[in-house]
Design a protein with these regions (language model features):
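Patatin-like phospholipase
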Residues: 1-27, 35-378
Length: 378
């Protein structure tokens, strides 16, 4: 459930961009967020997710419980079919007004699954009997077996993630003509989008935390990531892992960095072919959305640069230079001056991520390499 809070700042970004949905569908606790979106409870949702902890939404053992107490707790959880989420239910009861939800201009739908036979149930608000919206929202979020199945009118229901974490088909059935999807890559099934509708997909490069973990610090981080992921998906930022400005100066700096990095990489590779492992490190970083910034972003990630801030190409480079191990970067200098030993080249091959950092560091700190034309190379 931790990754749920990311959608709060997706919400904030969409509001800033003056994007107003006519239909919202959601699964699991994403359905809870969707309901609050329909009710325009942004501040309520934000404050809630920034303050609650795991034990505020589910029954957990005491923090200092001994091994015997933990075993007893686990036996009871297994016997009762999952943890008790009465605290979460009380929160839902407090913040969600069913009458207001039904009167809202935004149509709303959720997914849950009948435990018997794992039969999916895609439900619009109109399909849900009066007085049972909170029950079905809790059913959609019943992450069995960790949490108890939700019983409604004698039928037990499970988390909608057993059917579809991202119900695009339901949205189309309800009349959607364009989709903005938030893929949290959560536990469960995420079916491919076969609607054929124009779609903007919002995903995070970063790990968002445990699904059943609530923590204010992690929540704040995920909210910031969600905000920037949304602006990037909408074309207002560039980069893959980091939020980088796409203004003219930042783009000019990115192009200059990419050219200089390519020159340096080519020069080192030709003299020390064993350092090709740095190419592998770059591919494994999976920075596929922005080739010009990919080496800088990969190096920044390895150096531990904060991804929850807004950067220009220049300030991201400065953040990397401040975070990297300068002595370690300097140790690769002979590879760049052509005076390296076989042992130093082998070390670069064995430490591809660190050497990729060194390549970026050298690109940012060394004078520009002269251009070599084909005629000059003969």
């Amino acid at each position: 459930m931790e990754s749920l809070v990311k959608t709060q700042y997706v919400w904030r970004a969409l509001m800033e961009l003056d994007w107003h949905p006519q239909i919202i569908t959601g699964t699991s606790v994403g359905g809870l967020n969707g309901a609050m979106f329909v009710l325009d409870l942004y501040e309520t949702a934000r404050d809630m997710w920034l303050t609650i902890r795991s034990r505020d939404v589910m029954e957990l053992p005491e923090e200092n419980a001994d091994l015997s107490a933990l075993h007893q707790f686990l036996r009871r959880v297994v016997k009762e079919g999952g943890m008790d989420v009465t605290p979460l239910e009380e929160i839902v009861e407090r913040v969600l007004d069913e009458d207001a939800l039904r009167a809202a201009p935004i149509r709303f739908g959720i997914v849950t699954v009948e435990q018997r036979g794992l039969r999916p149930r895609e439900l619009t608000l109109e399909d849900i009997p009066a007085g049972q919206v909170r029950d079905y929202l809790m059913a959609s979020a019943a992450c069995f077996p960790a949490l108890r199945a939700r019983q409604i009118d004698g039928v037990k229901f499970l988390d909608g993630g057993y059917s579809d974490n991202m119900p695009t088909g339901l949205a189309k059935t309800m009349g959607a003509e364009e989709l903005v999807c938030v893929d949290l890559e959560g536990v469960g099934i995420t079916r491919p989008n076969l609607t054929g509708l124009p779609t903007t997909m919002i995903r995070s490069y970063w790990e968002l935390g445990d699904i059943l973990h609530f923590d204010p610090d992690t929540a704040k981080r995920n909210m910031e990531l969600g905000y920037y992921d949304t602006r990037r998906a909408m074309g207002y930022l560039r980069g893959c892992a980091y939020a980088v400005s796409c203004d003219a100066q930042s783009c000019e700096d990115a192009a200059a960095f990419a050219q200089k990095f390519s020159q340096l990489q080519r020069a080192v590779r030709e003299k020390y072919p064993v350092t090709l492992t740095a190419d592998v490190a770059l591919k494994l970083a999976n920075m596929t959305k922005d080739d010009q910034l990919a080496p800088l972003e990969a190096a920044a990630e390895d150096a531990g640069v904060d991804p929850t801030r807004f950067y220009t190409t220049r300030t991201l480079a400065q953040a990397f230079l401040a975070a990297c191990d300068k002595d370690r970067m300097e140790s690769f200098a002979p590879l760049f001056t052509g005076s390296s030993t076989a042992g130093q080249a082998a070390l670069a091959a064995l430490l591809p991520n660190t050497f990729l950092q060194a390549l970026v560091w050298r690109t940012l700190t060394a004078p520009a390499l002269p251009e070599v034309t084909e005629d000059e190379g003969l």
